[in-house]
Swiss-Prot record:
Entry's Gene Ontology molecular function annotations: oxidoreductase activity
Gene3D superfamilies recorded: Leucine-rich Repeat Variant (1.25.10.10), Scaffold protein Nfu/NifU, N-terminal domain (3.30.1370.70)
Protein name: Uncharacterized protein YpgR
One Pfam family recorded for the sequence: Virulence_fact
Organism: Bacillus subtilis (strain 168)
InterPro entries to which the protein is assigned, alphabetical: ARM-like, ARM-type_fold, Nfu/NifU_N, Nfu/NifU_N_sf, PBS_lyase_HEAT, Virulence_F_dom
Length: 377
């Protein structure tokens, strides 16, 4: 068994290693470092590499997952060595204390519709962040008036963010404080304490029509609370356009998330605007949305993002061009080939190789999945 090629995936922390041999149909194996003894020799060697978190083997490829604090430029030569293809150069651990490719998963522990605490994890590290006293008081009231708190508490996933744990924790707790006013907490507490079927419906998130004037409130927490309870539709684009100019980063980022959910061509100019936002988190989110939408009209905007100051934005732009780019991107990709960040440079080279060899763009992973489902219907 040898390596045919190594390709990036939608996650900067996973690489796809294409093999010359294929597993029997329907068979797959998932290996972790602690299971190395029972793994095939080649995979056992890969699991010994510093920074490798796991290997998933299915069909004709391996999905190698890394710890975000380790560089692929140190890991991949050792993966090739495990297959006997070439000797790995001795590489020192190269961890960045600045921006990381690490994906941080965000969870909020809920009790009858009321947030209790925030949990962040990158797969290796976990941190929890508490909420202010008023949230705890609401929980204490329900402990005495409702059923068993252990039974009713549950972790709700809030998606993925990038960056420093403390920064993300601060942002998420601040957003929850804004979204759950004293009035909303009181309403949720009273409804949950009833313990009836209709009460359970009452504590669920209620969407309402957000108007332009609601975003004029001087208190950013009230502006965010309105936006948080929006059910975004195409008719809400003018409101989201206004939110993109809000001085609060959390509001601009939430507006971008909603624009990505709408997905119609009308949102593209606004996502292009968000790609130039002064806040990196907003630009990253805009890039993710454009990648998920996968519209070739975004090629010029993503070409421009190849020179963004954030390596994550540059990586996302290169990934987009790999997925849907055409000949118009070749010049910019050639200029970006020697990006100082290994992951960005690799993704740029992959995009350039696909386009120059005349291979048809496959579209984003989400688009491929959608088309696959349609064919199966």
């Amino acid at each position: 068994m040898k390596i045919k090629s190594i390709e990036p995936t939608p996650s900067p922390n996973t690489m796809k290693v294409i093999l010359t041999e294929e597993l029997p149909a329907g068979k797959s194996n998932n290996y972790k470092p602690e299971q190395a003894e029972g793994a095939p020799l080649v995979i056992a060697e890969i699991l010994k590499i510093d920074g490798v978190k796991g290997v998933y083997h299915v069909a004709d490829f391996l999905a190698v997952e890394r710890n975000a604090r380790y560089d692929w430029k140190d890991i991949l030569p050792q993966v090739r060595t495990a297959f006997g293809m070439e000797s790995a150069e001795s590489a020192e651990e190269n961890r960045s204390d600045q921006e990381s490719f690490g994906e941080v998963k965000v969870f909020v522990q809920m009790f009858s519709g009321i947030p209790m605490q925030v949990k962040l994890t990158d797969g290796e590290r976990e941190e929890r962040f508490g909420l202010p006293e008023r949230f705890q008081q609401a929980i204490l009231k329900l402990r005495s008036e409702a059923s068993n708190v252990v039974f009713e508490r549950a972790w709700k996933e809030q998606g993925v963010r990038f960056g420093d744990f403390d920064e993300i924790g601060h942002d998420v707790t601040e957003e929850l404080q804004a979204a759950y006013s004293d009035e909303r907490l009181k309403r949720l507490t009273e409804a949950a304490a009833q313990g009836k079927g209709e009460a359970k419906q009452a504590v669920q998130r209620k969407a309402y029509k957000v108007t332009l004037d609601m975003l004029d409130d001087e208190d950013w927490k009230k502006r965010y609370a309105h936006l948080e309870q929006m059910d975004p539709k195409e008719e809400d684009i003018p409101v989201l356009q206004k939110a993109l100019d809000d001085p609060k980063v959390s509001i601009r980022r939430q507006a971008v998330v909603y624009l990505g959910m709408i997905e119609t061509p009308d949102v593209l100019p606004l996502l292009y605007k968000a790609l130039e936002d002064k806040a990196v988190s907003v630009r990253r989110t805009a890039g993710d949305c454009l990648s998920d939408i996968g519209d070739p009209q975004a090629i010029p905007a993503m070409i421009k993002s190849l020179s963004d100051s954030s390596k994550l934005v540059r990586w996302r732009a290169a990934m987009f061009l790999y997925e849907v780019g055409d000949e118009s991107a070749i010049e910019a990709l050639r200029a970006a080939e020697d990006d100082p960040e290994f992951e960005v440079s690799l993704q740029v080279k992959m995009a350039l190789e696909r386009i120059e060899h005349g291979e048809e763009a496959k579209g984003s992973v989400w688009k491929q999945m959608t088309e696959s489902r349609k064919k199966g219907e």
